Amino acid sequence: MLTLLSPAKKLLSISKHYSKETSNPLLLDKALQLVKIMKLKSVEQIADLMDLSRQLAELNYERYQNFDLKNNPMNHSYPALFLFQGDVYQGLNANSWKDEEIEYAQSHLGILSGLYGFLRPLDRIQPYRLEMGVNLENPAGKNLYAFWSKIVTNILNQILAEQSNPVLINLASTEYFKVVDEKKLSYPLVTINFYEQKNSELKMIGILAKKARGMMAKYIMQNRIDSIEQIKEFSESGYLFNKEISSPNSLNFI
């Protein structure tokens, strides 16, 4: 199985030092095409493009200007698993993982990215800000979905083909998973959702759902889950699988 997560806007200022072997992003050449486009943007244009404050726009302007295209794009880079922070990654709590769990995740966990397309946990990336939903004009079209959809879908099919149980587990947000062309997926897709029950009414509360997605990904990686039935046994933070509101392609927890 391959489990998908979204990235995070918030990045750790100092990433965990990981002494084992790391990797380069599979789609680095494509990512550098987007970096070249972003290098041409002014602070004001970056602020407008991503609806950022002046301070954040200046930070990301500097990030793109300092992005080393010619010599070593991996300069000042960190493993994606440890760089991303935020609600999902609090639930994931990768700093507590054992080395063998990280190694397992390298071929069973993926992170969708507006800049890098698709990332494995140990892929080294530079700090950046570029959400998948941004309308950044590029050679493929008017937004990043046009740029990445075919490429990301193809890489997912390639990775799934190497899995013993080729099922795509979607724990990503709607904004990010839209980049996947479901019609072109060659393997089954299962989306997992988390709800809160308030006065007999079910609601998806963003911050709680994000943390739960991270906890589910952690559960799958640390226990080397390889079947849908095992996923249904997840019970962290009181969440339980609810058969009545679920379907073969949508597993819902309350």
Curated annotation (Swiss-Prot):
Matching Pfam families: H2O2_YaaD (PF03883)
GO cellular component, one term: cytosol
Superkingdom classification of source: Bacteria
InterPro entries: YaaA
Listed GO biological process terms: response to hydroperoxide
Similarity field: Belongs to the UPF0246 family.
PANTHER family: PEROXIDE STRESS RESISTANCE PROTEIN YAAA (PTHR30283:SF4), PEROXIDE STRESS RESPONSE PROTEIN YAAA (PTHR30283)
Protein name (database record): UPF0246 protein lpp1320
